[in-house]
C-alpha cells in the first residue's frame, strides 16, 4: 500500500534522488519502513547539517527518543558499550549506552543540548572523554552489512546521508500523532506535505542501492 500512496511523489528511484538532494540542501527527510515491519516513519537528518530548529521540530513531532546512527568503528572509537549483552528486542536494534556531551550542555535535554551532544560525538577528533554516560541521546550501531543486510531505519539513515556526501552519521526519530500514537502512512504523508519534506521508503533505498551495484 505504501508504494501506491507514495506514487504522487515519484517512482522509487526518483524519491531517493529527491531525498538526497534535500539532504544536500540541509533539509530533513522522512523514511518509511515496511508495513509488515515497524510500519513507522522516521524523521532523518545528517548530523553534519542538523540545526537547533530542526532538532526542536524533531522533539516536538517525534517520539522524543532522538537517536544517533553510527558505525561500528565510531562506536569503538568512542568506547560505547552496547546497551545489553544479549539483544532480545524484536528487530535487534543496536542501542549502545546513552550519551551526553561532557562540555557545553546544561541538563542535556533541550534541543540545543541534544544537538551539542550529537556534534560532539560525530566530530572527527571525538574521544570517549568528550561524552558522559548516560545521557539524553541514544546512539544506534548500524549493521556492518548496511541496508542490504538489515532493512532498518538505522542502516537507511547512514546509507542515504552517505549517498548525499556526508559522514555516515544520521539523526532519526519516529513520527507520532498528537495523541501520542505512532504515525502511519496517511498521517506521515500529510505531515510531509505540511513541512515540505521529501519522503521515501526503505524499499526505495534498497532498490536504489541494488541498481548502483
From Swiss-Prot:
* SUPFAM superfamilies associated with the record: YrdC/RibB
Which parts of the sequence bind D-ribulose 5-phosphate? 37-38, 42, 150-154, 174
Swiss-Prot/TrEMBL site (Essential for catalytic activity) positions: 136, 174
- Tell me one GO biological process term: riboflavin biosynthetic process
Q: What does the record give under GO molecular function? A: 3,4-dihydroxy-2-butanone-4-phosphate synthase activity; magnesium ion binding; manganese ion binding
User: Which residues does the record give as Mg(2+) 1 binding sites?
Assistant: 38
Enzyme class, broadest EC rank: lyase
- Asked whether the keyword Nucleus is assigned, the reply is no
One Pfam annotation reads: DHBP_synthase
Q: Its annotated pathway?
A: Cofactor biosynthesis; riboflavin biosynthesis; 2-hydroxy-3-oxobutyl phosphate from D-ribulose 5-phosphate: step 1/1
Cofactor binding note from Swiss-Prot or TrEMBL: Binds 2 divalent metal cations per subunit. Magnesium or manganese.
Q: Which keywords belong to this entry?
A: Lyase, Magnesium, Manganese, Metal-binding, Riboflavin biosynthesis
- Enzyme Commission designation: 4.1.99.12
Can you supply one Gene Ontology CC term for this chain's record? cytosol
The residues the record assigns to binding Mg(2+) 2 are 38, 153
Cofactors named for this entry: Mg(2+); Mn(2+)
This chain's function reads:
Catalyzes the conversion of D-ribulose 5-phosphate to formate and 3,4-dihydroxy-2-butanone 4-phosphate.
- Which family is this sequence assigned to? Belongs to the DHBP synthase family.
Annotated HAMAP family: RibB
Question: What NCBIfam families would the database entry show?
Answer: ribB
Task: Give the multimer and partner information.
Answer: Homodimer.
Return the protein name: 3,4-dihydroxy-2-butanone 4-phosphate synthase
Amino acid at each position: 500500500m505504501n508504494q501506491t500512496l507514495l506514487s504522487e511523489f515519484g517512482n522509487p528511484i526518483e524519491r531517493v534522488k529527491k531525498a538526497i538532494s534535500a539532504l544536500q540542501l540541509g533539509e530533513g527527510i522522512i523514511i518509511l519502513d515496511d508495513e509488515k515491519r515497524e510500519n513507522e516513519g522516521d524523521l532523518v537528518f545528517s548530523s553534519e547539517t542538523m540545526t537547533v530548529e530542526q532538532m526542536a521540530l524533531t522533539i516536538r513531532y517525534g517520539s522524543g527518543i532522538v537517536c544517533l546512527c553510527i558505525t561500528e568503528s565510531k562506536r569503538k572509537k568512542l568506547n560505547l558499550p552496547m546497551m545489553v549483552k544479549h539483544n532480545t528486542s524484536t528487530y535487534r536494534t543496536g542501542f549502545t549506552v546513552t550519551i551526553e556531551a561532557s562540555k557545553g550542555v546544561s541538563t542535556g535535554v533541550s534541543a540545543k543540548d541534544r544537538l551539542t551532544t550529537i556534534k560532539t560525538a560525530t566530530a572527527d577528533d571525538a574521544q570517549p572523554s568528550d561524552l558522559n554516560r548516560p545521557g539524553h541521546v541514544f546512539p544506534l550501531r548500524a549493521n556492518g552489512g548496511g541496508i542490504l543486510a538489515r532493512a532498518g531505519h538505522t542502516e537507511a539513515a547512514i546509507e542515504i546521508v552517505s549517498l548525499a556526501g556526508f559522514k555516515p552519521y544520521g539523526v532519526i526519530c519516529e513520527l507520532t500523532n498528537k495523541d501520542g500514537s505512532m504515525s502511519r502512512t496517511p498521517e506521515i504523508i500529510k505531515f510531509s506535505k505540511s513541512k515540505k519534506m521529501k519522503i521515501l521508503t526503505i524499499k526505495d533505498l534498497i532498490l536504489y542501492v541494488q541498481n548502483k551495484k
